């Protein structure tokens, strides 16, 4: 595999890159005191450092900055801002929302186990709406929008972005851990190929800069053998099936 295929660029304009993050790569520098013990076979080099090394001949990569994070075992779209100013404006939106900075929204696809009964633990709540629903925890400090495609496939959109938020909400509130997410209760076993990959993919990134809105769909191409991600949901090219795409493209702002 060529280096550029390891972290493929899905889209590029004057403000940012969209890359398709593989599993097993941290998006931020990890704590080296624990990383070697918990992930002895994984290189701790973060995504941005690898990205710059691969695309070093590209004149704009030196000033690049990551704007958001994905857990090392999560795949899919990450936005990399080309400048400090762009990074600040995207971060401002993530912190304050509304018309602050550059708009950045992220939708994820998760394949979950069939527990089928929702939990109602203290400090957790589910709210249902006509288009989508809410998972809420810690008095509203952690909020995730979600919609079920079927009993094992969920599309989620972060409202807040706390560490492990989607993984926590799906396992603790819906009582349906993401496939292969052993840390959050998954019991289904997969081949060694998937040791550092769970069935959670950053599948759609929406940006708005000025009056221009762009929607990016990111294919699930990593270890796409039909095992972790069934052909019921992802075809051989990594594209999500039409029912999933339709939910990804729905406007959940209204």
UniProtKB/Swiss-Prot annotation:
The active site is at 71. It comes from the Eukaryota. The keyword Endoplasmic reticulum does not apply. The keyword Aminoacyl-tRNA synthetase does not apply. Keywords: Isomerase, Mitochondrion, rRNA processing. It is found in: Mitochondrion. Its EC number is 5.4.99.43. Transmembrane segments: none annotated. InterPro entries: PsdUridine_synth_cat_dom_sf, PsdUridine_synth_RluA-like_CS, PsdUridine_synth_RsuA/RluA, RluA_PseudoU_synthase. Its main location: mitochondrion. GO terms for cellular component: mitochondrion. It catalyses: uridine(2819) in 21S rRNA = pseudouridine(2819) in 21S rRNA. GO terms for biological process: enzyme-directed rRNA pseudouridine synthesis; pseudouridine synthesis; rRNA modification. One of its GO terms (molecular function) is pseudouridylate synthase activity. Coiled coil: none annotated. Belongs to the pseudouridine synthase RluA family. Pseudouridylate synthase responsible for the pseudouridine-2819 formation in mitochondrial 21S rRNA. May modulate the efficiency or the fidelity of the mitochondrial translation machinery. This is 21S rRNA pseudouridine(2819) synthase. The gene is PUS5.
């Amino acid at each position: 595999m060529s280096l550029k295929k390891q972290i493929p660029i899905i889209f590029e304009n004057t403000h940012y890159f969209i890359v398709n993050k593989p599993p097993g790569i941290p998006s931020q520098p990890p704590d080296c005191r624990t990383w070697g013990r918990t992930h002895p076979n994984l290189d701790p080099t973060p995504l941005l450092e690898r990205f710059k090394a691969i695309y070093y001949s590209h004149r704009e990569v030196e000033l690049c900055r990551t704007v958001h994070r994905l857990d090392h075992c999560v795949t899919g779209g990450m936005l990399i801002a080309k400048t400090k100013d762009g990074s600040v404006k995207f971060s401002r939106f993530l912190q304050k929302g509304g018309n602050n900075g550059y708009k950045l929204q992220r939708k994820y696809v998760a394949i979950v186990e069939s527990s089928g009964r929702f939990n109602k633990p203290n400090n957790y709540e589910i709210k249902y709406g006509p288009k989508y629903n809410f998972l809420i925890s810690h008095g509203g400090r952690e909020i995730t929008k979600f919609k079920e495609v079927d009993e094992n496939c969920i599309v989620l959109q972060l409202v807040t972005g706390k560490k492990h938020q989607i993984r926590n909400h799906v396992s603790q509130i819906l009582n349906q851990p993401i496939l292969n997410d052993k840390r959050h209760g998954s019991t289904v076993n997969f081949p060694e190929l998937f040791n550092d990959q769970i069935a959670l993919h950053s599948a759609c990134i929406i940006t708005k800069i000025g009056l221009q809105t762009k929607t990016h769909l990111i294919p699930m191409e990593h270890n796409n053998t039909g095992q972790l991600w069934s052909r019921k949901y992802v075809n051989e090219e990594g594209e999500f099936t039409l029912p999933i795409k339709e939910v990804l493209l729905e406007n959940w702002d209204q």
